């Protein structure tokens, strides 16, 4: 039974790695459940517009404008795998604004069998996290934020837990640019009876910039992710296909300059939002690193692309996104946010 659970655990971790190009027991902490964030590449958004969807990944976006707002998200990820999120924000005049987030990842149920293959029951596998974020506007140009989170894992009777913090800062320039710097998942594992190892958390430092164009209803965004980890190059099937000599069959190493450019490109994500009137927003992004890691040779795919839209109806905003994470994974994201002050 233990071997079977460990095998399933390895499969689930592979799903997490496919989704976010990171390994480890706690890779789900890098997975977004927000439709807006997913449509724009899955990274902390460098915008400050009181959208509670942004609070989980970027606590510097938490402010007084989020007071008494709520968000509900659902992700149809892959086969029986689905995620759900509940968010709420409140402002306390003396100590700042807070946002609470509960995320739940369900990986479905599996048959429990004896060594002879007889089904004796079933068991579930799931992850969850509880996040409390704080944010404050220091000046008209500066915002800061921090969050503490507990991450838990339950696979059959095996479990693990970790504690982490996020810190973030945001600067709004007088020229219209907004810059954001985030350090996520700084922490440690508390316990682990799955494999008795001390697994690291998926620490990352991400930089983002955005600007709303002056004469067009467009906001452009650019990210450089995983600043702490330069080398993202790997021997993907596409890379091998492109760099194998057709005559000798030998793999030819890419030049140093080409390696540098490709490596830098693997860190870049570009995206944008187009506002149509007062109630409709279109969103899209492209993640070259995701495409480089998960694309397949000689296939025309949309791996690395994501898109979505939002519709505002009175006190509600309904957001939908679809993200092409690999040739077999295109998760669907749905988020409903509401301003309880308007009820």
Where would I find each of the regions flagged by the language model?
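Generic N-terminal leader/processing signal
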Residues: 1-2, 281
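Generic start-of-chain signal for non-secretory N-termini
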Residues: 2, 19-20
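Sec-dependent signal peptide recognition
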Residues: 2-10
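Hydrophobic h-region of N-terminal signal peptides that target proteins for export
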Residues: 10-18
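Subset of outer-membrane beta-barrel
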Residues: 20-343
């Amino acid at each position: 039974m233990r071997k079977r659970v460990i095998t399933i655990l390895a499969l689930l971790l592979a799903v997490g790695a496919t989704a976010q190009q990171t390994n480890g027991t706690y890779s789900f902490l890098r997975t977004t459940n927000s439709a807006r964030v997913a449509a724009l590449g899955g990274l902390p958004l460098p915008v400050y517009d009181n959208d509670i969807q942004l609070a989980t990944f970027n606590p510097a976006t938490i402010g007084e404008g989020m007071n008494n707002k709520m968000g509900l998200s659902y992700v149809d990820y892959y086969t029986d795998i689905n995620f759900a999120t509940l968010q709420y924000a409140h402002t306390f005049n003396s100590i700042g604004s807070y946002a609470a987030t509960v995320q739940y990842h369900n990986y479905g149920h599996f048959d429990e069998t004896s060594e002879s293959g007889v089904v004796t029951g079933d068991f579930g596998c799931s992850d969850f996290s509880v996040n409390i974020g704080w944010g404050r506007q220091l000046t008209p140009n500066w915002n800061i934020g921090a969050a503490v989170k507990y991450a838990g894992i339950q696979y059959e009777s095996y479990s693990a837990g970790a504690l982490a913090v996020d810190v973030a800062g945001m600067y709004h320039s007088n020229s219209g640019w907004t810059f954001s710097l985030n350090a996520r998942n700084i922490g440690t594992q508390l316990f682990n009876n799955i494999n008795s190892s001390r697994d690291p958390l998926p620490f990352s430092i991400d930089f983002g910039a955005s600007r709303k164009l002056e004469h067009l209803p467009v906001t452009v965004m650019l990210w450089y992710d995983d600043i702490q980890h330069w080398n993202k190059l790997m021997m993907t099937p596409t890379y091998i296909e492109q760099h194998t000599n057709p005559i000798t069959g030998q793999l030819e190493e890419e030049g140093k300059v080409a390696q540098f450019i490709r490596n830098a490109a693997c860190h870049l994500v570009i995206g944008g939002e187009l506002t149509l009137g007062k109630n409709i927003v279109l969103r899209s992004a492209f993640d070259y690193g995701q495409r480089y890691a998960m694309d397949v040779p000689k296939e025309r795919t949309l791996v690395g692309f994501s898109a979505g839209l939002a519709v505002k109806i009175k006190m509600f905003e309904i957001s939908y996104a679809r993200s092409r994470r690999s040739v077999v994974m295109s998760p669907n994201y749905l988020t409903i946010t509401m301003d309880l002050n308007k009820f």
